[in-house]
Amino acid sequence: MSEKRDRDVEKIYSTSEFVSKLRRLADALETGERFEIQVSGERVYVPARAEFNIEHEREGDEEEIEFQLKWTNQ
């Protein structure tokens, strides 16, 4: 199996697309299943054992909230 390269991408979604993805994530969390999402051409599998956190950042007039899912591939 080839090693995956480091990657840091951000994708902008419409409100309806974002809501749909959040809904699928919530459903996966409630049922204890892994979550699958494609981001910028790469399919990502988030395991049910992932850890979750919410970050709030402020810099000048800009604010940001990030919902993060973190895990280690085994």
Please give the residue ranges for each predicted region.
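Short, structured protein-protein interaction patches enriched in aromatics and acidic/basic residues
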Residues: 8-9, 33-55, 59
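C-terminal edge-of-domain segments
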Residues: 52-74
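N-terminal acidic leader/helix
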Residues: 2-25, 30
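Short, low-complexity, charged amphipathic interaction modules
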Residues: 26, 36-42, 61-63, 67-69
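Absolute protein N-terminus
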Residues: 1-2, 74
